[in-house]
Amino acid sequence: MYIGLSWPANWLPAHSFVSDLFDDSALARIERQIDEWLGRARTSHANILAVDRSEEDEFRWYVRMAGEEKDFTTIWFTLGQRTLRYETYVMPAPEQNAEKLYETVLRRNEKLVGAHFSIGLEDAIYLRGEIGLAALNEVELDRIIGTLYSTVEQLFWPLLEIGYAKAAMLRTQRNSTRTV
């Protein structure tokens, strides 16, 4: 049934769909592109401290950034046959007000594009997402890095204050030592 929606003719290459498996040569090309794109991001963004690769066989990159609210944020990228997955650790499991904290991040998921909060190992809070390889380009990779970084920077202390009794006091102490 046609419902009147039309997509741009070039929104995806004619031979490529989200469900396509990329062969070894295509993955090698994408791997090289990601290396190049992350290298350029490293030189153009002062807060990116390091871009590293996994020592193992998997296609995995680490982007470490200095923050203002959270001292460091590291984003892990993992290349699969269909998608590039990404995640960053936000905070450990809450010691108190877990229900309120989980509600806060679930409600925040509604406002995020290309990422979502999730619960990981030991109930820690992560920010995760994935993008189809057919849609991956340098602009999208930069958007992903910016989205994860800015979301962590914006919500790190508010989430800690919900989940930890001493967080507000620590934040005040931290801010007072920065102004001295």
Map each language-model feature to its residues.
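Short, highly charged C-terminal tails/helix-capping segments
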Residues: 160-180
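A generic structural motif
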Residues: 90-94, 131-137
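Charge-rich, low-complexity N-terminal segments
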Residues: 1-72, 120
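Ampiphathic alpha-helical segments that act as solvent-exposed interaction surfaces
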Residues: 100-112, 133-164
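Generic alpha-helical secondary structure signal
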Residues: 25-28, 32, 96-100, 139
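A short beta-strand motif that forms the metal-chelation/ATP-contact edge
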Residues: 62-63, 126-129
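Short, internal acidic amphipathic alpha-helical interface segments
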Residues: 85-126
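The feature represents the first ordered module of a protein
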Residues: 65-99
